[in-house]
Amino acid sequence: MAEKNRILIVDDEDALRTILSSELIGAGYEIATAADGEEGVAEVKNRKFDLVLLDIHMPKLDGFEVLKFIKKEHPEVKVIMLTGFADLKNAIESKKYGAEDFVSKPYDLVDLLTTIERVLSE
């Protein structure tokens, strides 16, 4: 049996972390979560992930700072920004700092799963 892809969800919204975790586990992924940017950085330092789903606006350390850390220290980890602030400026900043894609909240599960599968296969 193939090893499951490991995904880290970094978002300060409790409900979103819970629901998205459940949906992604149901889709066959191994999931870990972090409630803010600092927790997200700690998780990436301590465990191997294939993909990080990353909110932008969070307490302690915002998503762009986490993205910069990941791309500098763990460039093999893919990142999809998942944010309620889906404007052109944030999309451009995300790409500038190395995110593979950008998905707005509220997300459509089928679209998000398609994006995750595409990014993981690249």
Predicted regions located by residue number:
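Active-site beta3 strand of CheY-like receiver
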Residues: 47-53
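Short, glycine/charged-rich "phosphate-handling" switch motifs in NTP-dependent
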Residues: 100
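C-terminal output helix
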Residues: 107-117
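Two-component/phosphorelay signaling modules centered on CheY-like receiver
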Residues: 14-32
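Receiver (REC) domain active-site loop signature in two-component systems and cognate sites
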Residues: 58
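Short, conserved "switch-loop" micro-motifs in signal-transduction and mechanochemical regulators
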Residues: 85-86, 97
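Acidic catalytic/metal-coordinating carboxylates
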Residues: 36-39, 62-65
